[in-house]
A protein has these predicted regions:
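Ligand-binding pockets and gating/stacking loops
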Residues: 1-293
Length: 293
């Protein structure tokens, strides 16, 4: 419906899918009870964009189409995965089986840090406008796998404090908080000498990063100084925490401050039904913000 233009499907409307297409592929429980597999073309219009001539859904993604020559379009990929989780895992890590580092972790591991006060790899989970059939997103998708844990993604929350416990408890000043962290880290170093678990060093670095983020995160997340034309560019939804537009704006601010890799998840694209009712809302969430970025 968005990127895979197949005009011939209009001529094949309601005809059965040829057996050569399925090629013996096993069925899922969602389709195993179907008596037939009729072909249904997209109901949207497609147009070619840019010098590359990429075909895109021009009804729902007109702004994204303006950047067709700036985007890497990969249309040669294939997978044997027939369900969401292994497919998502393969897209994030290159393998359907969990436990391998994701792309952001590799970027952190290979490139290092440009800002000691923010993580190398940040994850933002945007809330879709239409939340019908919304599915959970697991933190294992931004796991560092067999790489040191310090390279795992750090998820910023869309409500409350961006990072849990980033603020001092009531009545605890900064110097006391620093003394507490230093004491805990000293105990962790003693534990490492006894046990030798390398993840102990990860824990030490996490405590130290959390303390430094107390100063950097409030400035990062304060959008009050963003000029009005920025909100016109990204859309009014950019003012709403947790929206895709807000996440894209936050991603820009993170990258400007030296964060190596920012990944935004925008859920609820699993349209089993009412595609024409849900797809426009999803595309409206992402089209203008992606154009602005």
């Amino acid at each position: 419906d968005l990127f895979d233009y197949k005009p011939q499907m209009k001529e094949m409307y309601d005809k059965d899918l040829p057996a050569s297409i399925r090629n013996g592929q096993r069925l899922t429980t969602m389709t195993s009870g179907q008596a037939r597999f009729p072909i249904a073309p997209s109901k949207y219009n497609f147009s070619q964009f840019g010098q590359c001539g990429m075909w895109l859904n021009s009804d729902l993604l007109p702004n994204l189409g303006k950047h067709a020559d700036e985007i890497c379009w990969m249309r040669s990929l294939n997978t044997e995965a027939i369900n969401h989780e292994p497919a998502i895992c393969a897209m994030q890590t290159g393998n359907q089986i969990t436990g391998r580092p994701c792309l952001g972790s590799w970027a952190s591991y290979g490139l290092g840090s440009e800002n000691d006060n923010l993580p190398n790899f940040v994850v933002l989970i945007a809330t879709p406008t239409n939340r019908d059939q919304e599915q959970a997103i697991s933190s294992r998708l931004w796991s560092s796998g067999y790489l040191p844990g310090e390279h795992a993604g750090v998820s910023f929350r869309s409500k409350g404090d961006p990072i849990l416990f980033i603020n001092n408890p009531p009545g605890v000043p900064d110097d006391l908080r620093k003394q507490t962290i230093d004491g805990i880290n000293q105990l962790n170093r003693l534990n490492y000498e006894t046990v030798g678990d390398p993840e102990t060093h990860t824990r030490i670095k996490q405590y130290e990063m959390a303390f430094r983020m107390q100063a950097s995160v409030p400035e990062l997340t304060d959008l009050a100084k963003e000029p009005e034309h920025i909100f016109k560019l990204y859309g009014e939804e950019a003012r709403k925490r947790g929206s895709f537009a807000n996440s894209v704006l936050m991603a820009r601010r993170l990258v400007e401050r030296g964060v190596r890799f920012v990944q935004i998840y925008h859920n609820n694209w699993d349209h089993h039904s009412n595609v024409n009712g849900r797809m426009p809302s999803q595309c409206k969430d992402v089209d203008q913000p992606c154009h602005a970025l």
